Amino acid sequence: MPLRNLTETHNFSSTNLDTDGTGDDHDGAPLSSSPSFGQQNDNSTNDNAGLTNPFMGSDEESNARDGESLSSSVHYQPQGSDSSLLHDNSRLDLSQNKGVSDYKGYYSRNNSRAVSTANDNSFLQPPHRAIASSPSLNSNLSKNDILSPPEFDRYPLVGSRVTSMTQLNHHGRSPTSSPGNESSASFSSNPFLGEQDFSPFGGYPASSFPLMIDEKEEDDYLHNPDPEEEARLDRRRFIDDFKYMDKRSASGLAGVLLLFLAAIFIFIVLPALTFTGAIDHESNTEEVTYLTQYQYPQLSAIRTSLVDPDTPDTAKTREAMDGSKWELVFSDEFNAEGRTFYDGDDPYWTAPDVHYDATKDLEWYSPDASTTVNGTLQLRMDAFKNHGLYYRSGMLQSWNKVCFTQGALEISANLPNYGRVSGLWPGLWTMGNLGRPGYLASTQGVWPYSYESCDAGITPNQSSPDGISYLPGQKLSICTCDGEDHPNQGVGRGAPEIDVLEGETDTKIGVGIASQSLQIAPFDIWYMPDYDFIEVYNFTTTTMNTYAGGPFQQAVSAVSTLNVTWYEFGEYGGYFQKYAIEYLNDDDNGYIRWFVGDTPTYTIHAKALHPDGNIGWRRISKEPMSIILNLGISNNWAYIDWQYIFFPVVMSIDYVRIYQPSNAISVTCDPSDYPTYDYIQSHLNAFQNANLTTWEDAGYTFPKNILTGKCTSSKFKLSS
């Protein structure tokens, strides 16, 4: 296809015009000067004479024509040339026949032969618009013409809209010398019948694109959708997708839904069912754990004596502090295998099913954690979730079954875990029968009172504003009014506590220690008894406890170091040791002595609890005392070293024995001078419902006393 020659040199002047390409238009205005081309045929010259610039307005073309009709000394400047862009004062003088550097663009590389000719400002020639559609059209081109690259048609089948190349060729070859030639005018007025490699839309043939809004193509509906129709389809798209869904799409959708439902079942439903245990469909056959193979005859299994037949004869007596022999009045050797202690199972012991909230324990006391194995009672603590708590343990108590009033209580035990590890709370202790351990409503106003005066000591907070006491006052005081609720009016009653052992750890020296204490109320000033009446026998192993009490109890306590072999674990562990108390409750010569093994650790004499401040004498307990054996764990007791507590841990009890003077034997919970049975029976709600925390919650009220109740008592008179 012939293009305008940008490389050949052509000099022209106003006198060197082709006669076939000159003349006036129909208005008489002079036409633009057209240079003659020495190496181009006449047909090509004539074809280009009538062309106009499609990208210039009529005013711009008129100005261009006026500029072309100036003096012949001014050379012709084609529209769009580089020279036209220069300012008038600095525009290049094109009248000088100075050469321009050779063209070195794309076409110079593709047609090197055309570049070899001299450059003589031939770029001033008007653009050449001949179009070639086939090689035959270019047969008359000279070797200096630059050929365009092969035509690329993106849409080879665009229909009749594209002008045929034959028609274009006809327009390109029609003569243009006649001003009235309609064919030439039609061709020159159509800006899109120019060379095919030019397009204002990015380099493709202009004839291949629709340029008018009314032109239509077969794929217009894809590019110009109807908004209303699209909106209607959008509203029904979900329904139509299902309505016109083929089998393959339906099967794919079903597969996706199936995978989604399977994922929900596997990752949500199945874990929930597994966690709740809803799918643990075990057989209906009840599993029974046999604690022992021993067969007990129904009648011979009943013990007829408080002293266990398995107790050796050498243990039938015990020597007291004064050298007298006290006789054995009760014993339990726990030699029978598989004993259980649910309520009603055993005549002497009960394993309660409670949470010990009084000390904010972390375990739940469950009856199934207390049983007899290998000739011992075992209280087992597991990291086993129970009743919303994460630990389960055992407690055994003889409340309202076996009690004693003064005497000696001896217990042989192997303590749990390691002695050097802090956290566990093993306990061997006693408490007055008017309070049941773990049942807070029953203990309110009686624990740990041991008081026989009618003064500030029986009032709430001891009538002291300094916060020494948070107790509600003594419920069963000595001066209870006539007609009030009292087990035996005229006697001060309570539920004091004596601890044979509470296990803890001395973390500085890494050994276990035994806290042995008396818990009483009301309290001394600063919780300090008279230490002139307290004996410590060996200060290398026993010292008075730095903890002397708090607003809920006064604790007269001493701590003694223990051997690491007396614990469950350890290189030499597994040995048993006996712990004991010995006490007499005489007001003048009474005492309490504690033992580790056969060695006494310290003694409190009755005179250590003399009047102090606005309170009177605290007495060594005259109440019938029940026995409690338990293994607990609580942050209120000691730092818990979790990583070294190896659950399950077990406190083993070899035996429990009670000794009393032969002239003062009382192994009952309802002695005549300190009765408890009738009182308990008339207030069973407080003693059987562990969820009740106050006496009022159980439905009862504190009895009035003559000190604060404005009433009288026939059993007690205030001294003047």
Swiss-Prot record:
Xref: InterPro entries: ConA-like_dom_sf, GH16, Skn1/Kre6/Sbg1
Coiled-coil residue spans: none
UniProt GO MF annotations: glucosidase activity
Lumenal side: 274-720
Topology versus the membrane: Single-pass type II membrane protein
Cytoplasmic topological domain residue ranges: 1-252
Record's subcellular location: Golgi apparatus membrane
Modified positions (Phosphoserine) in chain numbering: S81, S116, S133, S134, S136, S139
Family matches, as PROSITE patterns: GH16_2 (PS51762)
GO biological process: (1->6)-beta-D-glucan biosynthetic process; fungal-type cell wall organization
Membrane-crossing segments per the record: 253-273
Keywords: Cell wall biogenesis/degradation, Glycoprotein, Golgi apparatus, Membrane, Phosphoprotein, Signal-anchor, Transmembrane, Transmembrane helix
Biased composition regions of type Polar residues, renumbered to the chain: 1-17, 31-51, 69-90
Compositional bias (Low complexity): 133-142
Domain GH16: 289-664
UniProt region (Disordered), positions on chain: 1-90, 117-142, 167-189
Protein task: Involved in the synthesis of (1->6)- and (1->3)-beta-D-glucan polymers of the yeast cell wall in vivo. It is required for full activity of beta-glucan synthase in vitro. May be involved in the maturation and transport of cell wall proteins (CWP) to the cell wall. May act as a transglucosidase and contribute to the construction of a protein-bound glucan-structure that acts as an acceptor site for the addition of (1->6)-beta-D-glucan at the cell surface.
PANTHER family in alphabetical order: BETA-GLUCAN SYNTHESIS-ASSOCIATED PROTEIN KRE6-RELATED (PTHR31361:SF1)
Complexes and interactors: The cytoplasmic domain interacts with the actin patch assembly proteins LAS17 and SLA1. Interacts with KEG1.
Family: Belongs to the SKN1/KRE6 family.
Extra remark beyond the main annotation: Present with 4760 molecules/cell in log phase SD medium.
Name the record gives this protein: Beta-glucan synthesis-associated protein KRE6
